[in-house]
């Protein structure tokens, strides 16, 4: 354990608060949830509830390297966020900007091949089977006139 406490720790290219427990701080990284963070901490032999700022420089480096290549830690495939990648055919786990870019590319690919989901994305409609009759409306709302105002309008008009 290092002698000093760090309030900001850089892990896998992301600045994380050092005053949070390891699993909750790691959950601030896009693509890492609490369950994944707990599994990674367990595989590396780190206490999941130890404050992130108390980790030594070597432990932080080990953690960053593990997060960059989560697939190699031996986690079960259902824990990974990109199983059976359609282009590479392998199970992967993406984090940070890699995840955002891949999701954007997937949506563009769906639009390009004009799949049902791609067409829904193109039209700006809901994609996952939600109802659209009443919810998700866009544009201006049409107001409803009330009693007295309605009566005055009928007399005048």
Swiss-Prot record:
Domain of life assignment: Archaea
Membrane-spanning intervals of the chain: none
Record-level Gene Ontology MF annotations: rRNA binding; structural constituent of ribosome
Disulfide bonds: none
Electron transport keyword on record: no
Keywords assigned by UniProt, alphabetized: Ribonucleoprotein, Ribosomal protein, RNA-binding, rRNA-binding
Keyword flag Zinc: no
InterPro entries the record matches: Rbsml_uS13_C, Ribosomal_uS13, Ribosomal_uS13-like_H2TH, Ribosomal_uS13_archaeal, Ribosomal_uS13_CS
One annotated Gene Ontology cellular component of this protein: small ribosomal subunit
Chain's role: Located at the top of the head of the 30S subunit, it contacts several helices of the 16S rRNA. In the 70S ribosome it contacts the 23S rRNA (bridge B1a) and protein L5 of the 50S subunit (bridge B1b), connecting the 2 subunits; these bridges are implicated in subunit movement.
Subunit structure: Part of the 30S ribosomal subunit. Forms a loose heterodimer with protein S19. Forms two bridges to the 50S subunit in the 70S ribosome.
Family the entry assigns: Belongs to the universal ribosomal protein uS13 family.
Record protein name field: Small ribosomal subunit protein uS13
Taxonomic classification: Archaea, Thermoproteota, Thermoprotei, Thermofilales, Thermofilaceae
